Amino acid sequence: MFSLQNLCRKTLPDCKLPEFFDEYILQLLGLYWENHGTIQRAGNNCVLIQQHTLIPVNEALRIAASEENYEIVSLLLAWEGNLYYAIIGALEGNRHDLIRKYDDQIKDHHEILPFIDDPVIFHKCHIMRRCFFDCILYQAVKYSKFRVLLYFKYRLENDLPLAHLLIKKACEDHNYEVIKWIYENLHIYNIMDTFGCAIAHKDLRLYRLGYTFIYNRIVPYKYHYLDVLILSGLHLLYKVAAKGYLDFILETLKYDHNNDNLDIILTQAATYNHRKILTYYIPQLTYAQIEQCLFMAIKKKSSKKTLNLLLSHLKLSIKLIKKISQYVATYNSTNIIGILNMRRKKKIYLDIILTKFVKKAIFNKFVVRCMDTFSINPERIIKMAARINKMLLVKKISEHAWKNHAARLKHLKHAVYTMKHKDGKNRLMNLIYDHYYYHMQGEEIFSLARFYAIHHAPKLFDVFYDCCLLDTIRFKNLLLDCSHIIGKNAHDATNITIVNKYIGNLFAMGVLSKKEILQDYPSIYSKHYMP
């Protein structure tokens, strides 16, 4: 009998039932639905009742379950009916035994909810899951079940925090119809949930919906003088400009007409390196506005690309560079130095900025970091620092750039050779004597003496004294060489006088004889520097 029943179930759906089959035979075959008539399969998704009524298989399954007709439920499930509809029907008919029979086949009762529109059945199904009440409303929002939301409207009106959570959920799901329903049916005036989610998810449609709500719900047309107050309190332009959302900015400007909007946009674009926004607005700006935007970008330490974009629309001049240098020094913002460093023809502009930065930098480490970052020649910074008497910076850079004594001395000497600023040269030579002289030995000291003689170093005679103590014979030759070197610079009368006095003192000490002086230093005798 069971094999015959299965055969009939398999083959009869595609043909009409024989007329001689009476109700008893159909019941034995499992093809008779009590109170409804014969039942046979019609395609994959429908069943034929009494050979003339066609209904979806899932609808038939829901009805059979509500009647607790196990045989027909089993038949319809075999015909690929959805088990969820059996549970729904059982809930509608309060058929708890049938629910228990199939319940263990349901992994998550939340999956049944999309198929339920009746709020009572929706609630019953959710209770089976033993979730919190709030979860019912989350599911209603998720599946756009407006009848369920309306059924629990009284709860939402008395629990605005929950209503805001539902709005946030709907925003995250981009469920615009639910958002509109909540705002239209509940007394909610705080719309930051909508705007916040729109910005977070870059959802322009949702963003527009927020403005629609302001104008249609919060600000009736006869009270539009309130819109400026409401919109300014939301600070939306700051937020969308900071994100770099140009479409959102343009949408905001349709409603927000404050005079300082352009300044807000440019400030945020420069701060957060939104070059797309800058490119859009720069053609609309005056030269002075582009300048101010550049200064803001320097202040906020914007990227090189942002700075380069703004610089490309400005004409470099000494006046502009001086303004730039003030911002670089004040805010320790050095990216623009890297840009000018690549423009070799603009060396004078870079020197102006570097000098200002070296002069105003609060910490020496900022200057060192800038030098390393943009591969600036250390000697260049050293000479700038020496000119403005920042000798601690000179010492730090020389020790940072050249790790051993010989290299340090070599580069400092070269800086002296190439430097024109007299006081700066003297400061560098004093630095060499004060900090590196004690490392020197023999030949290095004599070499330094000649170097000092060439550059008229203030410490020359201190070095002479040490040379005299080291080797009197070599010292006499050194003194003669240095005297001739200084003598070539006849315009420097002060140094010549000092040398003459020094030689006279050496005569008094017995280091030089009168004969040696008259032979090698005739100027001494004529000027009466000997006792």
Swiss-Prot record:
Originating species: African swine fever virus (isolate Warthog/Namibia/Wart80/1980) (ASFV)
Family of this protein: Belongs to the asfivirus MGF 505 family.
Function: Plays a role in virus cell tropism, and may be required for efficient virus replication in macrophages.
Organism classification: Viruses, Varidnaviria, Bamfordvirae, Nucleocytoviricota, Pokkesviricetes
Superkingdom of source: Viruses
Protein's recorded name: Protein MGF 505-1R
Classification via InterPro entries: MGF_505
